[in-house]
A protein has these predicted regions:
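A short, charged, Gly/Pro-tolerant segment at domain boundaries
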Residues: 80, 86-104
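Glycine-rich phosphate-binding loops that contact phosphosugars or nucleotide phosphates
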Residues: 1-76, 82-83
Length: 104
């Protein structure tokens, strides 16, 4: 099993709880974040740093408000990853739907 987490700040407390539980269960963990020094980035097996501002950062990277740029990049990236994994694993969308879990 694989847990994918998206957190611009990399410090979201509820997601840190999920991360800890996943690690206890021996799951692989991946975090997508703007903050390479965050707790989630340190705890994850793999981390992917997205160059965008999170809603908590002061520096402006985009004219878009708060974490919009991060969320848009995360959507595109995870869609590409999902499509490629489904192709490589020969999983159709019905199987994918049945295996998906949203913890929020």
């Amino acid at each position: 099993d694989l847990l994918l987490i998206g957190s611009g700040s990399g410090e979201t407390k509820t997601l840190r709880v999920y991360m800890e539980k996943a690690k206890q269960l021996g799951m692989k963990t991946v975090v997508f974040t703007c903050n390479r020094e965050s707790a989630l980035a340190r705890e994850a097996k793999f981390s992917c740093v997205i160059r965008a501002q999170s809603k908590f950062q002061d520096g402006r990277i985009s004219v878009q408000p708060m974490g919009s740029l991060f969320e848009q990049q995360l959507l595109l990236l995870t869609d590409c990853i999902t499509l490629e994994l489904a192709r490589r694993m020969n999983i159709d969308f019905e199987q994918l739907k049945n295996r998906h879990s949203n913890l929020e």
